[in-house]
Design a protein with these regions (language model features):
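C-terminal accessory module of base-excision DNA glycosylases/AP lyases that mediates lesion recognition
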Residues: 1-15, 19, 112-121, 127-185
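Alpha-helical ds-nucleic-acid-binding substructure associated with the helix-hairpin-helix region
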Residues: 46-121
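Short alpha-helix boundary/capping elements
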Residues: 33-38, 51, 95, 141-142
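Structural motif
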Residues: 12-23, 33-35, 77-82
Length: 185
């Protein structure tokens, strides 16, 4: 397990997402239509506001309380209701399928296909997030089953510093522009 991941400007958030499996999972779940930095500081803000990052506690939390935590300025996400609902649903899956332990999603996966299926069944995880999350698991946590999920294009798993993050974001913008150009051709 790495000491930190360099996905935010906050040392505390970077340590949290590296050391707390549910924090990493929540970060990926809300990494949509906000910056990487905002998504990956989300779990730290959530823990500060609700007092825990315990999957059973979040799954059982009053939805209005969780939404308030997401909405309170500065908001955790630009779509606080939707992301609060997504995180609560994610935590419920972690409770129901993995005994409340997020890391069981990857530590108990039998191979890449099983890991892809497990990640893909999580609320808010499509193809891009499966490969992004898989790349982090493979390249930072040494998860063997995730090795096949590492894409050739720039991804979060290949970030090892603040400089890498800036390069990743520039490459990601270029990659998306290329995909849009191909689609319109």
């Amino acid at each position: 397990m790495p000491e930190a991941l360099y996905f935010t400007d906050s040392d505390e958030a970077n340590r949290l997402i590296a050391q707390e499996p549910l924090a990493l999972l929540i970060s990926f779940a809300i990494d949509q239509q906000v910056t990487v930095q905002q998504a990956f500081t989300g779990p730290l803000k959530l823990r500060e506001r609700v007092g825990t990052l315990d999957a059973p506690a979040i799954a059982e939390m009053d939805p209005a309380t969780l939404e308030t935590a997401f909405r309170t300025p500065p908001a955790i996400h630009r779509f606080p209701r939707a992301m609060a609902q997504r995180v609560q649903a994610l935590c419920q899956v972690v409770v129901d399928e993995y005994g409340g332990k997020a890391e069981r999603i990857w530590t108990e996966a039998t191979d890449a296909a099983d890991l892809r299926k497990r990640i893909g069944a999580l609320p808010g995880f499509g193809k891009m997030k499966i490969t992004g999350f898989g790349s982090v698991l493979a390249l930072h946590f040494g998860v063997e089953a995730a090795q096949e999920l590492v894409p050739e294009y720039p991804c979060l798993g290949k970030i090892n510093s603040a400089e890498d993050l800036a390069e990743y974001q520039a490459a990601k913008r270029a990659h998306k522009a290329s995909l849009r150009a191909q689609a319109s051709a």
